[in-house]
A protein has these predicted regions:
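Two-component system phosphorelay core
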Residues: 1-113
Length: 113
């Protein structure tokens, strides 16, 4: 199970997230472990690849809630950015933002092993 020190080193704002998790380290760590396995990351990728910006917005918005509540800052920053761009249906290449999101998710997933 990932430790608070590992999460801090990765960039999570543990001090912000812990009160939301009743200051229970094991509970927070379990939630982080579940978050990195969230299928919504892949659904976001699939929706963007299909050009379905409405679905992509739904998935990005859902991820924003998860990553924000757990204060997973390195993922949350690009998730928030892509959510707002999708909300306004900005015509652009979402690939770089998606790559950053998935890269940070994968890095955190490795730490959770």
């Amino acid at each position: 199970m990932i430790t608070l020190e590992q999460l801090r080193a990765w960039g999570a704002d543990v001090d912000e997230a812990m009160p939301r998790c009743l200051n229970n380290e094991a509970f927070y760590s379990r939630l982080v472990g579940k978050a990195v396995e969230e299928p919504t990351f892949d659904r976001l990728r699939e929706a963007l690849e299909a050009g379905d910006l409405d679905k992509a917005f739904e998935y990005a918005h859902a991820l924003k809630g998860v990553t924000g509540n757990l204060a997973l800052t390195p993922i949350d920053r690009p998730v928030r950015e892509i959510t707002e761009l999708l909300r306004s249906r900005t015509d652009m290449d979402y690939g770089p933002l998606l790559a950053e999101i998935l890269s940070q998710r994968d890095a955190l997933r490795e730490l959770c092993k």
